[in-house]
Amino acid sequence: MLKKIVIGVTATAAFGIGAGALAGGSVDQSYNNTSGAGFYVRGEAGYGLVDKKSGTSKVNFTGVTLTENSHTNTKKSRGFNGRVAIGYAFNPYFSLESGFTYYHPAYRDVNIAGSALPLFSSVQAEGRQKINLYSIDLMGKATLPIDNFYAFIEGGVAYVHTKFVAFTETGTAVSPLLPPVTSSVAVKVPSSSKGYIRPKAGIGVGYNITQNIGVDVSYSRVFGQGKINNTNYLPNLNAVTLGLTYKF
């Protein structure tokens, strides 16, 4: 699905940019034919989502070990993604850029099951945890200018801050008595925050409207780590965005 989104957005943007250039007639000046050196600012907005993951782990409940199953809630883990950045272009082909990115929260659904306590034969409980995400990155960008158009690839590192919001898994415990006795259970999971330094990469195409203003469409990815049921879990963060650059 992600591949289709990237291809579709890129193709649409490229068609729109090309159509706009043709509609304006022949281009007398290529805005890429300058020294290219100087500072610039950039803003991006678009669509973010995380990869689907699932996993199993063991948790302690009243002194008894239960099985916890976790999986990504892909429907809720997608939405608005935004980034602001400042950079310096050494020439038309290479620049350094640092930015702050807000990611749409990720969600994981969890449930626990098993036997607990001598008086209870089975326990079933479930819940949903929200993961808030933002990052600060440092990226190197290689650009290939083609008249007023340009293509670019970028790579670097991102510090990703995550906050796992506290939540409660609720459900029932059923005793082996006759008749069975059903009781409510609640497993509270506290909030936690962590920071990660992870690789980030991106690719995109753009068009220089003037010597100072450019628009682009791009895809970027922060490579996560760990399994979804581990304490060091960070999902892969994907974003498809439209960008606007102003060159000083």
Curated annotation (Swiss-Prot):
One Pfam family hit: OMP_b-brl
Main location: membrane
InterPro entries in alphabetical order: OMP/PagP_b-brl, OMP_b-brl
N-terminal signal peptide: 1-23
Compartmental location: Cell outer membrane
GO annotations of cellular component type: cell outer membrane
Keyword match Signal: yes
Keywords assigned by UniProt, alphabetized: Cell outer membrane, Membrane, Signal
Protein name (Swiss-Prot/TrEMBL): Uncharacterized protein CBU_1260
